[in-house]
């Protein structure tokens, strides 16, 4: 009887762990979003609870634990998956100058709300992920603004890279033209805004599930918060192929150039 009781207790503990695990992971809606898409983070109700992205379809922030073990790494070189790290967002923040934790944060207590990234020893390469559906689209372009939010004495070199991949597995591919070597200025400055526009390669067109991400890395010195704002994804429609009913019939120029003859005319020669 004691053995059965112990087995039941063990089973209950495992079941509880599974339930808690599922609950902790149910914090995001990673449904691929249709294009065009715009996100300016002006709606403060989208992120109301720490680590909960469920009201922001397609977007998920990750802390990027252990994606790199070195300080000052160029995030262009960090292309591994990273989605097994903790889902991250510090909700309802208002003091980017003094908020020291690293990862992803929502600053809705500032005049122009935004979601931002900041590296740290734990959050070695935090990133913001966006799931997209580009099926039926070509010439896919992404525009956004990197905003320096930290007006304190901090003056780190805070780089930001932009990457993509097809589907949800494998390494990301960096887009060098989108790289910003230092998205912040200082000390005691928080005015820099860096607009970026990038065209995705042809292989990113016409995809049911495409992932893009903004990623930074733990910098030398005290890292600074960098906002990822004014996100816009645009594209052109891929024209539908003509149907049989609308296709023009093929012609034979050589035959059409000759006048038609009746059987009688033909026999007279």
Regions found by a protein language model. Give the residues of each.
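Short beta-strand elements bearing conserved aromatic residues within extracellular beta-rich modules
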Residues: 160-162
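C-terminal substrate/ligand-recognition segments
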Residues: 140-142
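A long-range scaffold signal marking pre-active-site subdomains of enzyme folds
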Residues: 31-82
């Amino acid at each position: 009887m004691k053995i059965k009781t112990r087995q039941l207790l063990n089973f209950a503990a495992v079941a509880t762990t599974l339930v808690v695990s599922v609950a902790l992971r149910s914090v995001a809606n990673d449904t691929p979003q249709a294009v065009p898409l715009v996100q300016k983070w002006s709606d403060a109700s989208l992120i109301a609870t720490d680590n909960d992205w469920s009201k922001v379809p397609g977007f998920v922030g990750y802390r990027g634990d252990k994606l790199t073990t070195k300080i000052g790494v160029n995030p262009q070189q960090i292309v591994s998956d990273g989605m097994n790290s903790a889902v991250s967002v510090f909700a309802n923040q208002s003091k980017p100058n003094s908020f020291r934790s690293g990862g992803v944060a929502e600053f809705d207590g500032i005049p122009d709300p935004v979601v931002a990234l900041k590296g740290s020893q734990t959050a070695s390469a935090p990133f913001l992920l966006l799931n997209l559906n580009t099926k039926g689209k070509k010439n896919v372009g992404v525009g956004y603004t990197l905003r320096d939010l930290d007006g304190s004495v901090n003056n780190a070199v805070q780089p930001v890279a932009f990457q993509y991949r097809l589907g949800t597995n494998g390494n990301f591919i960096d887009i060098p033209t989108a790289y910003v070597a230092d998205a912040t200025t200082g000390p005691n400055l928080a005015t820099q805004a860096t607009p970026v526009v990038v065209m995705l390669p042809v292989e990113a067109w016409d995809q049911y599930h495409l992932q893009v991400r903004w990623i930074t890395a733990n910098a030398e010195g005290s890292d600074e918060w960098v906002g990822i704002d004014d996100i816009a994804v645009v594209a052109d429609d891929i024209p539908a192929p003509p149907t049989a009913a609308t296709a023009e019939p093929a012609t034979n120029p050589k035959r059409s150039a000759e006048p038609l003859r009746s059987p009688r005319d033909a026999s007279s020669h």
